[in-house]
Amino acid sequence: MSVPADAPILTSRAMRDAEAACAASGTSLSELMDRAGAAVADTAWRMAAGAPVLILCGPGNNGGDGYVAARLLRERGANVRVAALAPPTTDLAKAARAKWAGAVEPIDETLAAEPVVVDALFGVGLTRPLASNLTGQLQALAFRRVIAVDVPSGVDADGKHDWVPPLPAHVTVALGALKPAHVLLPAAQHCGRVLLAGVGIACDATIRSLPRPRASAPGVTSHKFNRGMMLVRSGAMPGAAALAAAAGLRAGAGYAVLSGANTAPLSAIIVEDGANYRERLGDKRVGAVVIGPGYPAGMALDRDVASAIDSAKPLVLDAAAIDAALPRLRGGGVTAILTPHEGEFVRAFPGAEGGKLERALAAARATGSVVIY
C-alpha cells in the first residue's frame, strides 16, 4: 500500500461537511462530481494504455462519478463499457447518467470483464457489508487491474469495521482527502496505491498523513557516539528486545546496548547481563531507551520502567511496560512513545471509544504521549 505524504485525512462525516461547505461557498456539487469523474478518467486512461475499460456504477454519487468518467473516456476515444447495479437514485447521479450516451449493462453472472475495471459502486456512505450474491459476482472480476473510486466497494471508509471488499484495488483515487481506510489496517491493504485527487474542496483537517522518514547518510566525521546510543532493556524473553536493538542500528543509531540478555542477532549489538542497567541509564551518551518488548509484567518490570522514566531519557514503551508506566504518564510531566498492538491497547485503554483514529487520539491525550497503534 502507498499513500501521499502530508495529505488531509477526513472521516466520511467530515468529508460530507466539507462538501456542503464547498457548495455553500458557490461551487456546485455537480461541478465537484465532474472534477471527481475527470480524475478517475485520467487514472483509467493512463492505466489502460489503450486497453478496454469496464466501469461499474452504483446507484449513488459514487456511481455518478463513474458515469462522468465513462463519458470523458469515451470522448477521448477509449473503448469503455458501463455496467450498473441499479438505476441512479440521487439527482446528481441521474444527471451524470443522462449525459452518458452509451449502453448500460446489468451486473450479474453474465457480465464479461475487461483488462481494467473501475469500481464506482459504493463510496464513503456504505453502512453495511455487501450482499453475498453481489460479492460473488464481483469476485469473478477481481483478477483485473482495478481502480477504486474513493474507496474499494465493501470497505468501511472510516476503518471501524473489518469488511473485506470483493474487488481489492490496485489503485484507489481518493477524492478531496484521504479517508481513514486509506491509512489504517486492515482496510488499507485493499486500497493498493492511493492517489489523492484535489477536486477543489477546502479541507481543514487536523489529521494528516506522515511523510516517509528520511535518514541522513553518515558523514565522514560520523562515529558511533555522535550518532546516538540506544539502550534496550530485555526481560525473560529477549528475542523481541534483540530485534528492537537490531532495528535501531539499521535505522541509524551509532550503537545499541541490549541489557538483560546473553545473545543478540547482530555482532554489533553490545550485550550486557543487566546488572548495570541503572548505571547505563545515567550514561550521557544514551539518547533513547526502549523497554517492554518480551518483558513480562511484574515487580522487576515496574522497577525498570520507573528507573527509565526517572532518567528523563527519550523513552519507547511497549507491551506490559505501557501498563507499568500509565500512572505516571497520566499524571503529566512524562512523555513517551507507546507502541501497543490491538490487545495491549485494549488492556491499557479499555474505555477508549470510536474508530481507531479516535481511540489513538484519546490515548495520546490521556498520556501526553505519542501512540503508534
Where are these regions (language model features)?
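Short coil-to-helix leader/linker segments, especially the first N-terminal amphipathic alpha-helix
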Residues: A95-E105, D204-P213
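Small-residue (G/A/S/T)-rich helix-start motifs and N-terminal tracts that mark the onset
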Residues: M1-L85, V116, A169-V171, A177-I337, ...
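Feature captures the FAD/FMN-dependent oxidoreductase FAD-binding
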Residues: A96-A101, L111-A120
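A glycine-rich helix N-cap at a beta->alpha junction
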Residues: R74-P87, R97-I107
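Internal gly/pro-rich beta-alpha loop/helix module
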Residues: E114-V116, L121-I207
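Short beta-alpha junction loops
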Residues: A86-T89, V151-S153, A321
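N-terminal beta-loop-helix "entrance" segment that forms/cooperates
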Residues: T90-K99, A264-A268
